[in-house]
Amino acid sequence: MASTNFRPLHDRVVVRRVESEAKTKGGIIIPDTAKEKPQEGEIVAVGSGARDESGKVVALDVKAGDRILFGKWSGTEVKIDGEDLLIMKEADIMGIIG
């Protein structure tokens, strides 16, 4: 798992995309070339937090295991231990699911 081999710094998080369904509710199969990348993911690892104006570290609102929604163009795609992941700032996260 990426969290043991990579620790993001400051207010960054490592996210694993949650794959979308390959078939629509009506039964139409969507080929990989037509699929959009999912904007939902699971947090794998979190940084220690950002510093406020006084220099105090402010912890993140998210934690490893949270399911999140993020912007379409959020994050930087990386490959860690052979797994495709995203690294993004906490500000790129729109919300926590559940």
Swiss-Prot record:
GO process annotations (BP): chaperone cofactor-dependent protein refolding
Designated name of the protein: Co-chaperonin GroES
Homology family: Belongs to the GroES chaperonin family.
Function: Together with the chaperonin GroEL, plays an essential role in assisting protein folding. The GroEL-GroES system forms a nano-cage that allows encapsulation of the non-native substrate proteins and provides a physical environment optimized to promote and accelerate protein folding. GroES binds to the apical surface of the GroEL ring, thereby capping the opening of the GroEL channel.
Entry keywords, A to Z: Chaperone, Cytoplasm
HAMAP family: CH10
GO molecular function: ATP binding; metal ion binding; protein folding chaperone; protein-folding chaperone binding; unfolded protein binding
Keyword field contains Cytoplasm: yes
Localization terms from the record: Cytoplasm
SUPFAM superfamilies the UniProt entry points to: GroES-like
Membrane-spanning residues: none
Species annotation: Rhizobium leguminosarum bv. trifolii (strain WSM2304)
Quaternary organization: Heptamer of 7 subunits arranged in a ring. Interacts with the chaperonin GroEL.
SMART domains according to UniProt: Cpn10
GO CC annotations, alphabetized: cytoplasm
InterPro entries, per database record: Chaperonin_GroES, Chaperonin_GroES_sf, Chaprnonin_Cpn10_CS, GroES-like_sf
